């Protein structure tokens, strides 16, 4: 009995230690923070907003996006606890199984089918045949990397559109400086105020955050 409780304690400790990592790769955090980083680079202001602010914005928006999933997980865990008549260290695994289903549903909804198929094929090639035969495309071991890859692809597509909008300003400013004979002036330094002005006039923060949130409808 003590060995079982010790093993369950180890499993719970490992699960708690992996929570920050899981919060980054199996939530909306990855896409949001990458898009915000690409936006900062596109604007040409390398240190503003600072990394702490970007991470804070990404965490807050991710908490909003993931709130229904988290609440559903807590509700199912509560139902499991009531069914067990309480909980102790030996009943952690059934509790985790009940709580992970909402996350599986979220990942499955927002994961590209092509990426899931890739990891399923890779498992057939890399895993032992007996283990690969038991694998399903909605298992977390498949969904987690497929979701992360889907999010990164989506983030870079959004980043490309952001860069495309601001690079036009860079080109216009560079041509104007050359026409005025000011070739020694760095175009990027002159373009930054105009980029910021365009971003403010277009209500850029609201448009970008609203767009990111709406990708998870």
Curated annotation (Swiss-Prot):
GO cellular component terms listed in the entry, alphabetical order: plasma membrane
Pfam family, one: FliP
Cell compartments where the protein resides: Cell membrane
Highest taxon of the lineage: Bacteria
Regions that span the bilayer: 6-26, 52-72, 158-178, 190-210
InterPro entries the UniProt entry points to: T3SS_IM_P, T3SS_YscR-like
Keyword Membrane applies: yes
Function: Involved in the secretion of PopA, a proteinaceous elicitor of the hypersensitivity response in plants.
NCBIfam families cross-referenced by the UniProt entry: PRK12797.1, yscR
Family: Belongs to the FliP/MopC/SpaP family.
Protein name: Hypersensitivity response secretion protein HrcR
């Amino acid at each position: 009995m003590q060995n079982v409780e010790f093993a369950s304690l180890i499993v719970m400790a490992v699960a708690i230690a992996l929570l920050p990592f899981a919060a980054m790769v199996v939530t909306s955090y990855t896409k949001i923070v990458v898009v915000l980083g690409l936006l900062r680079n596109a604007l040409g202001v390398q240190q503003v907003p600072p990394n702490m602010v970007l991470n804070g914005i990404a965490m807050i928006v991710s908490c909003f996006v993931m709130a229904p999933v988290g609440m559903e997980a807590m509700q199912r865990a509560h139902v499991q606890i009531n069914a067990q008549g309480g909980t102790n260290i030996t009943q952690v695994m059934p509790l985790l199984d009940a709580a992970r289903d909402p996350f599986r549903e979220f990942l499955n909804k927002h994961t590209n089918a092509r990426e899931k198929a890739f990891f399923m094929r890779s498992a057939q090639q890399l895993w032992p045949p007996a283990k690969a035969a038991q694998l399903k495309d909605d298992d977390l071991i498949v969904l987690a990397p497929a979701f992360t890859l889907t999010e990164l692809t989506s983030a870079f597509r959004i980043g490309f559109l952001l860069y495309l909008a601001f690079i036009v300003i860079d080109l216009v400013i560079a041509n104007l400086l050359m026409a005025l004979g000011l070739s020694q002036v760095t175009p990027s330094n002159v373009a930054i105020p105009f980029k910021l002005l365009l971003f403010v006039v277009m209500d850029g923060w609201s448009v970008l955050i609203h767009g990111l949130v709406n990708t998870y409808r």
